[in-house]
Amino acid sequence: MIHFNLLETQLTPLASFQEIMKKTSIYHLPSFHYLMDSEAQEDTREAYDDKQVVTEIMARCFIPTLITTTSWESFHFIGHEIRITEAMDCYGAVVWPSALVLCYFLETNAKQYNMVDKNVIEIGAGTGLVSIVASLLGAHVTATDLPELLGNLQYNISRNTKMKSKHLPQVKELSWGVALDTNFPRSSNNFDYILAADVVYAHPFLEELLITFDHLCKETTIILWAMKFRLEKENKFVDRFKELFDLEEISSFPSLNIKLYKAVKKNRRSV
């Protein structure tokens, strides 16, 4: 399992994450830690590590110092301030903690998962934060989502990557399971990475999402997927996902109910 590197930060967390921060503040190991058996010690250490890293992740979100007529939230990754415009009345136009987890992972594991000059697609890009971070890390990025979200997605990506990214990110419509052969023909799908954050929840398009993952993947494509577990439906989707992909849990954040997965397509000839 991959361990994140802790980084120092002076950023103030947003009010929307204050409750999470209270629950995940860094604390010292209890004085009786060394009186526990080895298994209990390991459980305590993992809880301690989880809270340390989650505190650092959430601290990447901070309160704007200027009050403007436009509502936006600010984040700090790859040495850049990233300003994101959200729409609180739409699930797809809000930055969720899973996106912060995935961004932090990409930044702190940039050597192992090198994005430079890689072809990357994000499905369910929402506000575009993950796509922006991947672009700032040097990737050829295609950010996708539903047509009604593309305007805000394009705005956020353009304002945060112009003159900063090695490659100009693309924004495209992608409704899961719809016109995949037309809009994303398999012959031109040469994605090194598929990124996804919080795309699995109580919506009626889980089968279409699975079809989309399968369609976009080649044998060499790596999926990096951050997922928040809320209901039994999420567990059932993971079971279905495992029928098509080899799935590896690379990190877990119990205090957030979020897991980070790496997946590759199963070798159909060996199934």
Curated annotation (Swiss-Prot):
<feature type="binding site">
    <location>
        <position position="145"/>
    </location>
    <ligand>
        <name>S-adenosyl-L-methionine</name>
    </ligand>
</feature>
<dbReference type="GO" id="GO:0008276">
    <property type="term" value="F:protein methyltransferase activity"/>
</dbReference>
<feature type="binding site">
    <location>
        <position position="176"/>
    </location>
    <ligand>
        <name>S-adenosyl-L-methionine</name>
    </ligand>
</feature>
<keyword id="KW-0489">Methyltransferase</keyword>
<feature type="binding site">
    <location>
        <begin position="124"/>
        <end position="126"/>
    </location>
    <ligand>
        <name>S-adenosyl-L-methionine</name>
    </ligand>
</feature>
<dbReference type="InterPro" id="IPR029063">
    <property type="entry name" value="SAM-dependent_MTases_sf"/>
</dbReference>
<keyword id="KW-0808">Transferase</keyword>
<feature type="binding site">
    <location>
        <position position="96"/>
    </location>
    <ligand>
        <name>S-adenosyl-L-methionine</name>
    </ligand>
</feature>
<comment type="similarity">
    <text>Belongs to the methyltransferase superfamily. METTL21 family.</text>
</comment>
<feature type="binding site">
    <location>
        <position position="197"/>
    </location>
    <ligand>
        <name>S-adenosyl-L-methionine</name>
    </ligand>
</feature>
<dbReference type="InterPro" id="IPR019410">
    <property type="entry name" value="Methyltransf_16"/>
</dbReference>
<dbReference type="GO" id="GO:0032259">
    <property type="term" value="P:methylation"/>
</dbReference>
<protein>
    <recommendedName>
        <fullName>Putative methyltransferase-like protein 21E pseudogene</fullName>
        <ecNumber>2.1.1.-</ecNumber>
    </recommendedName>
</protein>
<dbReference type="GO" id="GO:0032991">
    <property type="term" value="C:protein-containing complex"/>
</dbReference>
<dbReference type="Pfam" id="PF10294">
    <property type="entry name" value="Methyltransf_16"/>
</dbReference>
<comment type="function">
    <text>Protein-lysine methyltransferase.</text>
</comment>
<keyword id="KW-0949">S-adenosyl-L-methionine</keyword>
